[in-house]
Amino acid sequence: MNRYKYILSIFLVKAGIKLIIIMMISSSLYSQENSHNLNFMFTNNGYGFGYESEKFLKENLSIGADLRFYDIRSDEYPVYDPFVNQYKIIGEKNITMLPLYLRLNYYPFQGKIANNFEPYLLFALGPMLSIDGDENIRSFSKRWSNAETQISPGGSIGIGINFNTSTSNTLAFGLGYDYLKVEEPIHDKKDYGGAFLYLKYKINRE
């Protein structure tokens, strides 16, 4: 990717982050409760983690930012080499995806069942930054400084369940589907989406 496209990609990501922050601040004027969560993601293409802020607009509806980091590992697998008596990785790739989503959580049964059990639906939409590092470059800094990047639209839908405790901490788990398609193929592949499982830990509630 040439320098112009790289600068444009960075600009779009920064603009997306600013837009999410502005929407979060404006929504906080009407929010009943704020929370900050850590997410741990397990996907069919790898794994990841993320940060999620949640602000309730109504008792059963929240809005917030959903920032994720995906380490793509779908085509990698270990192979035993008897000559050196060690395992080596075949098909190693250095692909990172950074979705920057605006997220809505809808709690259809809020106030209708036990308060410590909260099913919800999630909808997330926003830009995704894809970074393809050159695995043939051994230097970590050079590998990522020369990486190709591109911006694509992304999104998620899913279901989850919050398990509230007597403290402010909450554990949750859920299932969902990611839409992660890139315009230009990365290692001959465009679609890195699919099903995912996530675990969520609420680190702070205001």
Language-model features: locations:
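Membrane-embedded beta-strand positions of outer-membrane beta-barrel proteins
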Residues: H36-F40, I63-L67, L102-L104, P119-L125, ...
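Sequence/structural signature of outer-membrane beta-barrel proteins
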Residues: S35, N45-Y47, I72-S74, G111, ...
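Short glycine/proline- and aromatic-enriched beta-strand/turn motifs that initiate or cap beta-hairpins
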Residues: L29-Y70, K200-E206
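Extracellular loop and loop/strand-boundary signature of outer-membrane beta-barrel proteins
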Residues: S35-N39, Q86-E92, S141-A147, V182-K189
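Outer-membrane beta-barrel "beta-signal"
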Residues: Y101, N105, D191-E206
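Residue-level signature of outer-membrane beta-barrel architecture
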Residues: S53-K55, Y106-P108, I161-T165, Y201-I203
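Residues that define the transmembrane beta-barrel architecture of outer-membrane proteins
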Residues: N34, N45-F49, E59, N94-L100, ...
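Gram-negative (and chloroplast) outer-membrane scaffold detector with strong preference
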Residues: K55-S139
